A protein has these predicted regions:
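Cell-envelope/extracellular polymer assembly enzymes that use nucleotide-activated donors
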Residues: 142-145, 175, 316, 331
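N-terminal signal-anchor transmembrane helix
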Residues: 110-146, 150-172
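Membrane-embedded multi-pass helical conduit in multi-pass membrane proteins
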Residues: 84-114, 118-119, 125-128, 136, ...
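Acidic donor-binding segment of Leloir-type glycosyltransferases
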Residues: 165-209
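Acidic donor-binding loop at a coil-to-helix junction in glycosyltransferase catalytic cores
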Residues: 326-332
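Catalytic donor-sugar/metal-binding loop of nucleotide-sugar-dependent glycosyltransferases
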Residues: 333-351
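Long helical/loop segments within the catalytic core of UDP-sugar-dependent glycosyltransferases
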Residues: 193-229, 241-326, 358, 362, ...
Length: 521
């Protein structure tokens, strides 16, 4: 009887244990399912937020449409007026239009020359030597998040991780996020292999969704970021190892209205071919003279796409990056200025890969030109409000510099073409639409403008080696490439405004020149 009772009790306990185990497993599965659903919901929320960050802060400054209703009305009315004048007098209308274009061209050239001359004085740059940077106490350094978006470039990650690990910053205060598209399996695999078990690196997968742009990925990473400061690097970058410390020092001691520090950019393969030499000179002027010139004039700074260092709170306040703008950097720089913040230019160099392939270069440059036009159109949707926020002079500087960059590329080739046609064919039509005053203005624009551009290139190259001086002399050929890129940008601005043409990297064949070389701006 006792044995039967014990057997019955054992059977009951066994059944009860089985039921409890089954319930526990179901509860575990439910929690796992709930966690997965919560994670999926969190991912979806972060994705939508990464697209809408700017829309929530400034819905009128999102570049999801090329022209606002008001701008379309101006275009239609302006086009109608020009058409009516053409009907009344073709020659007079063309003469006036050509004269207006010449004056606009001269104004843009004058602005660039003024910025160049101001930028030659390196006092506009924030300069911190390596010894001072290393002496800055670690205890005063803030936490830092480094965002590195990448797509379709698995070959760069070995070098990338090596370059970022060389950054001299307390590891406990540093987090580095590699922002990768979730369906880019080859790049994800390469990144995870390169990162290994390095604690301050994390691979963040950005869900595949439109718009598939760098700024959307940056926003996705920013939402997860924990650092007080945020830096952006590209996947092929080789930053100055002390750049984070230097930027942190600047932002620690600067007034609260200094929200961003832009480091200078150069190339590690400047002498690979003629295109890379031209590109190097281009960067030398942009980061070495033109941006410092803007700093001295206290004008808006169109940021470069990498080596930007921000206060995270300010970045979130202004809406971060526009997910639809293909030059989100230039747009953000202007938006910071509109919000009352300033940008400094730091004399610390990040080396990039200079584009050495002609087709690849045109793709990249046309995206930049398209983005500059996008940016200007966005900020001119409400021109009177824009003027009130930043002032008349900064507004004119922004229009002539940001808008003038692609405009000069097109008009320079237009003037060259007109002069060539005139000297070869001397068409009677030119005599009718180009009276003496307009003709001489045009000649001044062509001869004087090209002389000024060539002079600035030669001056920028004078401290470099002879190969860059020769490239500067041959720069008129580079202007033809610029015109091609600007024309392509104008077409894409209408047909595919938010399309991000990927720049192919890894074409440098292992070049590794030192920061003190001609690559440095």
């Amino acid at each position: 009887v006792i044995s039967q009772v014990l057997a019955a009790v054992g059977l009951i306990l066994c059944c009860t244990g089985g039921v409890l185990h089954l319930q526990a497993r179901r509860e575990k599965d439910r929690r796992r399912s709930d966690a997965a659903a919560e994670a999926a919901a969190g991912t979806a929320t972060r994705l939508q937020l990464s697209i809408d960050l700017l829309r929530r802060a400034h819905p009128d400054q999102v570049a999801d449409t090329t022209f606002s209703v008001g701008q379309l009305q101006v275009l239609i009315i302006g086009g109608t007026i020009i058409a009516l004048f053409l009907v009344a007098s073709v020659h007079l209308t063309i003469m006036v239009l050509v004269g207006a274009v010449i004056l606009l061209y001269l104004a843009s050239l004058a602005v660039r020359l003024r910025l160049f001359r101001l930028g030659l004085d390196q006092d506009a740059l924030v300069q911190i030597d390596d010894r001072t940077a290393r002496a800055f106490p670690d205890s005063r350094l803030p936490t830092y998040t480094v965002l590195v978006p990448a797509y379709g470039e698995p070959e760069v990650f070995g070098r990338l991780v090596e370059n970022l690990r060389a950054l001299e910053y307390p590891r406990e205060k540093l987090e580095i996020m590699l922002l990768l598209e979730a369906d880019d399996t080859e790049t994800i695999s390469a990144a995870r292999k390169a990162v290994g078990d390095v604690l301050d690196f994390s691979v963040v997968l950005v869900p595949a969704a439109e718009p598939r742009t760098k700024p959307k990925a940056l926003n996705y990473g920013l939402i997860k970021a924990r650092g007080d400061l945020v830096a952006v690097y590209d996947a092929e970058d080789r930053p100055d190892p002390l750049q984070l410390r230097k930027a942190a020092m600047v932002l620690a001691d600067a007034p609260a209205d200094v929200a961003c520090v832009q480091a200078k950019l150069g190339f590690f393969n400047p002498n690979q071919n003629l295109i890379t030499r031209w590109f190097t000179l281009d960067y030398r002027m942009w980061f070495g003279e033109l941006l410092p010139g803007l700093v001295r004039l206290r004008a808006p700074i169109p940021l470069g796409g990498t080596s930007n260092h921000f206060r995270r709170t300010v970045l979130l306040e202004v809406g971060a990056w526009d997910a639809f703008n293909v030059t989100e950097d230039a747009d953000l720089g202007i938006r910071l200025y509109r919000a009352g913040y300033r940008t400094g230019v730091l004399d610390s160099i990040t080396l990039e890969e200079a584009n050495s392939d002609l087709v690849n270069w045109v793709k990249q440059r046309s995206r930049w030109y398209k983005g500059y036009a996008q940016t200007l159109l966005v900020h001119l949707r409400q021109p009177d409000r824009f003027r009130r926020e930043i002032g008349l002079r900064p507004l004119l500087l922004t229009c002539l510099f940001v808008g003038g960059t692609p405009m000069l590329a097109v008009l320079n080739s237009f003037f060259w073409g007109c002069v060539i046609v005139w000297f070869i064919f001397q068409p009677h039509f030119f005599r009718e639409v180009l009276p003496t005053l307009t003709y001489f203005l045009g000649m001044i624009s062509w001869i004087g403008g090209n002389a000024v551009i060539l002079y600035t290139w030669l001056l920028s190259a004078r401290r470099a080696e002879d190969k860059l001086v020769i490239a500067a002399i041959l720069s008129p050929l580079y202007w033809i490439l610029m015109a091609m890129a600007a024309t392509k940008a104008a077409v894409q601005l209408i047909t595919a405004p938010s399309y991000w043409e990927k720049t192919q990297h890894g074409l440098d064949h292992g070049s590794a020149e030192e920061p003190g070389s001609a690559a440095a701006a």
